[in-house]
From Swiss-Prot:
Belongs to the ATPase B chain family. The gene is atpF1. GO terms for cellular component: plasma membrane; proton-transporting ATP synthase complex. The lineage of its organism: Bacteria, Pseudomonadati, Pseudomonadota, Alphaproteobacteria, Rhodobacterales. It comes from Ruegeria sp. (strain TM1040). Its main location: membrane. The keyword Transmembrane helix applies. The chain crosses the membrane at residues 4-24. F(1)F(0) ATP synthase produces ATP from ADP in the presence of a proton or sodium gradient. F-type ATPases consist of two structural domains, F(1) containing the extramembraneous catalytic core and F(0) containing the membrane proton channel, linked together by a central stalk and a peripheral stalk. During catalysis, ATP synthesis in the catalytic domain of F(1) is coupled via a rotary mechanism of the central stalk subunits to proton translocation. Component of the F(0) channel, it forms part of the peripheral stalk, linking F(1) to F(0). Keywords: ATP synthesis, Cell inner membrane, Cell membrane, CF(0), Hydrogen ion transport, Ion transport, Membrane, Transmembrane, Transmembrane helix, Transport. InterPro entries: ATP_synth_b/b'su_bac/chlpt (IPR002146), ATP_synthase_B_chain (IPR050059). It is found in: Cell inner membrane. One of its GO terms (molecular function) is proton-transporting ATP synthase activity, rotational mechanism. This is ATP synthase subunit b 1. It is a single-pass membrane protein. F-type ATPases have 2 components, F(1) - the catalytic core - and F(0) - the membrane proton channel. F(1) has five subunits: alpha(3), beta(3), gamma(1), delta(1), epsilon(1). F(0) has three main subunits: a(1), b(2) and c(10-14). The alpha and beta chains form an alternating ring which encloses part of the gamma chain. F(1) is attached to F(0) by a central stalk formed by the gamma and epsilon chains, while a peripheral stalk is formed by the delta and b chains.
Amino acid sequence: MRATLAIALTLATTSPAFAAGGGWNLGNTDFVVILAFLLFIGILLAAKVPSLIGKQLDNRADSIKSELEEARALREEAQTLLASYERKQQDVQAQAERIVANARDEAAAAAEQAKADLAASIARRLTAAEEQIASAEASAVKEVRDRAITIAVEVADQVISKQMTAADANKLIDAAIQDVEAKLH
Protein backbone atom coordinates (compact mmCIF):
# COMPACT_ATOMS: atom_id res chain seq x y z
CA MET A 1 0.00 0.00 0.00
CA ARG A 2 2.79 2.41 0.89
CA ALA A 3 4.75 1.50 -2.17
CA THR A 4 1.73 2.14 -4.38
CA LEU A 5 1.19 5.48 -2.71
CA ALA A 6 4.86 6.40 -3.21
CA ILE A 7 4.69 5.53 -6.92
CA ALA A 8 1.46 7.49 -7.38
CA LEU A 9 2.97 10.52 -5.70
CA THR A 10 6.08 10.22 -7.83
CA LEU A 11 4.11 10.08 -11.05
CA ALA A 12 1.85 12.93 -9.98
CA THR A 13 4.73 15.20 -9.08
CA THR A 14 6.98 14.37 -12.02
CA SER A 15 4.53 15.42 -14.70
CA PRO A 16 4.87 19.13 -13.83
CA ALA A 17 8.62 18.67 -13.91
CA PHE A 18 8.43 17.26 -17.45
CA ALA A 19 6.10 20.06 -18.48
CA ALA A 20 8.79 22.59 -17.63
CA GLY A 21 10.60 21.25 -20.59
CA GLY A 22 13.66 19.36 -21.56
CA GLY A 23 13.01 15.92 -20.09
CA TRP A 24 15.51 14.56 -17.64
CA ASN A 25 17.51 17.65 -17.12
CA LEU A 26 19.41 18.06 -13.85
CA GLY A 27 19.47 21.77 -14.36
CA ASN A 28 15.81 21.85 -13.45
CA THR A 29 15.85 22.40 -9.68
CA ASP A 30 12.29 21.27 -9.24
CA PHE A 31 13.17 17.92 -10.69
CA VAL A 32 16.25 17.60 -8.46
CA VAL A 33 14.26 18.50 -5.37
CA ILE A 34 11.59 15.96 -6.29
CA LEU A 35 14.23 13.28 -6.87
CA ALA A 36 15.95 14.09 -3.55
CA PHE A 37 12.63 14.01 -1.76
CA LEU A 38 11.68 10.67 -3.32
CA LEU A 39 15.12 9.29 -2.48
CA PHE A 40 14.74 10.50 1.12
CA ILE A 41 11.28 8.91 1.36
CA GLY A 42 12.65 5.70 -0.13
CA ILE A 43 15.49 5.58 2.38
CA LEU A 44 13.06 6.19 5.22
CA LEU A 45 10.82 3.39 3.95
CA ALA A 46 13.76 1.05 3.41
CA ALA A 47 15.04 1.66 6.94
CA LYS A 48 11.53 1.05 8.25
CA VAL A 49 11.56 4.42 9.99
CA PRO A 50 7.75 4.81 9.88
CA SER A 51 7.31 1.53 11.73
CA LEU A 52 9.98 2.58 14.25
CA ILE A 53 8.29 5.94 14.72
CA GLY A 54 4.95 4.14 15.01
CA LYS A 55 6.41 1.79 17.63
CA GLN A 56 7.87 4.70 19.58
CA LEU A 57 4.58 6.56 19.38
CA ASP A 58 2.74 3.41 20.47
CA ASN A 59 5.22 2.92 23.33
CA ARG A 60 4.84 6.54 24.36
CA ALA A 61 1.03 6.21 24.18
CA ASP A 62 1.23 3.04 26.28
CA SER A 63 3.48 4.75 28.85
CA ILE A 64 1.10 7.73 28.97
CA LYS A 65 -1.83 5.34 29.43
CA SER A 66 0.00 3.52 32.22
CA GLU A 67 0.89 6.85 33.85
CA LEU A 68 -2.75 7.90 33.58
CA GLU A 69 -3.86 4.59 35.11
CA GLU A 70 -1.28 4.98 37.86
CA ALA A 71 -2.42 8.56 38.48
CA ARG A 72 -6.04 7.38 38.55
CA ALA A 73 -5.13 4.62 41.01
CA LEU A 74 -3.19 7.10 43.16
CA ARG A 75 -6.14 9.48 43.07
CA GLU A 76 -8.52 6.71 44.16
CA GLU A 77 -6.09 5.69 46.91
CA ALA A 78 -5.81 9.31 48.04
CA GLN A 79 -9.60 9.62 48.08
CA THR A 80 -9.83 6.40 50.09
CA LEU A 81 -7.21 7.69 52.54
CA LEU A 82 -9.00 11.02 52.76
CA ALA A 83 -12.30 9.30 53.52
CA SER A 84 -10.55 7.09 56.09
CA TYR A 85 -8.95 10.10 57.78
CA GLU A 86 -12.25 11.97 57.74
CA ARG A 87 -13.94 8.98 59.42
CA LYS A 88 -11.12 8.79 61.96
CA GLN A 89 -11.40 12.53 62.58
CA GLN A 90 -15.15 12.17 63.12
CA ASP A 91 -14.54 9.24 65.47
CA VAL A 92 -11.96 11.25 67.40
CA GLN A 93 -14.35 14.22 67.54
CA ALA A 94 -17.15 11.97 68.84
CA GLN A 95 -14.79 10.42 71.39
CA ALA A 96 -13.67 13.88 72.52
CA GLU A 97 -17.30 14.93 72.92
CA ARG A 98 -17.96 11.77 74.98
CA ILE A 99 -14.93 12.49 77.15
CA VAL A 100 -16.08 16.07 77.70
CA ALA A 101 -19.61 14.88 78.53
CA ASN A 102 -18.22 12.28 80.96
CA ALA A 103 -16.00 14.91 82.54
CA ARG A 104 -18.99 17.23 82.96
CA ASP A 105 -21.03 14.41 84.50
CA GLU A 106 -18.18 13.48 86.83
CA ALA A 107 -17.70 17.14 87.79
CA ALA A 108 -21.42 17.48 88.53
CA ALA A 109 -21.35 14.27 90.59
CA ALA A 110 -18.23 15.48 92.42
CA ALA A 111 -19.95 18.82 93.12
CA GLU A 112 -23.03 17.02 94.47
CA GLN A 113 -20.80 14.78 96.60
CA ALA A 114 -18.93 17.84 97.87
CA LYS A 115 -22.24 19.49 98.76
CA ALA A 116 -23.35 16.34 100.60
CA ASP A 117 -19.99 16.08 102.39
CA LEU A 118 -20.18 19.76 103.34
CA ALA A 119 -23.73 19.34 104.66
CA ALA A 120 -22.64 16.28 106.68
CA SER A 121 -19.61 18.17 108.02
CA ILE A 122 -21.79 21.13 108.99
CA ALA A 123 -24.25 18.77 110.69
CA ARG A 124 -21.39 17.08 112.63
CA ARG A 125 -19.95 20.42 113.67
CA LEU A 126 -23.41 21.66 114.66
CA THR A 127 -23.97 18.52 116.74
CA ALA A 128 -20.52 18.90 118.33
CA ALA A 129 -21.25 22.56 119.07
CA GLU A 130 -24.63 21.65 120.61
CA GLU A 131 -22.93 18.99 122.73
CA GLN A 132 -20.30 21.50 123.84
CA ILE A 133 -23.05 23.99 124.69
CA ALA A 134 -24.94 21.31 126.65
CA SER A 135 -21.73 20.31 128.45
CA ALA A 136 -20.97 23.95 129.21
CA GLU A 137 -24.53 24.40 130.51
CA ALA A 138 -24.20 21.30 132.68
CA SER A 139 -20.83 22.49 133.95
CA ALA A 140 -22.24 25.95 134.64
CA VAL A 141 -25.26 24.46 136.45
CA LYS A 142 -22.92 22.23 138.51
CA GLU A 143 -20.70 25.18 139.36
CA VAL A 144 -23.76 27.23 140.34
CA ARG A 145 -25.07 24.34 142.50
CA ASP A 146 -21.67 23.76 144.07
CA ARG A 147 -21.34 27.46 144.77
CA ALA A 148 -24.90 27.57 146.13
CA ILE A 149 -24.16 24.57 148.38
CA THR A 150 -20.94 26.18 149.56
CA ILE A 151 -22.74 29.44 150.27
CA ALA A 152 -25.59 27.56 151.98
CA VAL A 153 -23.13 25.64 154.15
CA GLU A 154 -21.32 28.84 155.07
CA VAL A 155 -24.60 30.58 155.83
CA ALA A 156 -25.80 27.56 157.81
CA ASP A 157 -22.50 27.49 159.69
CA GLN A 158 -22.83 31.15 160.52
CA VAL A 159 -26.48 30.74 161.54
CA ILE A 160 -25.78 27.64 163.61
CA SER A 161 -22.71 29.14 165.24
CA LYS A 162 -24.71 32.21 166.22
CA GLN A 163 -27.70 30.27 167.50
CA MET A 164 -26.01 27.19 168.97
CA THR A 165 -24.36 27.01 172.31
CA ALA A 166 -21.30 24.93 173.14
CA ALA A 167 -23.41 22.31 174.94
CA ASP A 168 -25.68 21.92 171.91
CA ALA A 169 -22.61 21.56 169.68
CA ASN A 170 -21.18 18.84 171.91
CA LYS A 171 -24.48 16.96 171.82
CA LEU A 172 -24.53 17.08 168.02
CA ILE A 173 -20.93 15.87 167.82
CA ASP A 174 -21.66 12.97 170.19
CA ALA A 175 -24.75 12.03 168.16
CA ALA A 176 -22.73 12.10 164.94
CA ILE A 177 -20.04 9.86 166.46
CA GLN A 178 -22.62 7.34 167.64
CA ASP A 179 -24.28 7.40 164.23
CA VAL A 180 -20.93 6.67 162.53
CA GLU A 181 -20.15 3.86 164.99
CA ALA A 182 -23.53 2.28 164.34
CA LYS A 183 -23.01 2.39 160.62
CA LEU A 184 -19.48 0.96 160.79
CA HIS A 185 -20.34 -2.01 163.03
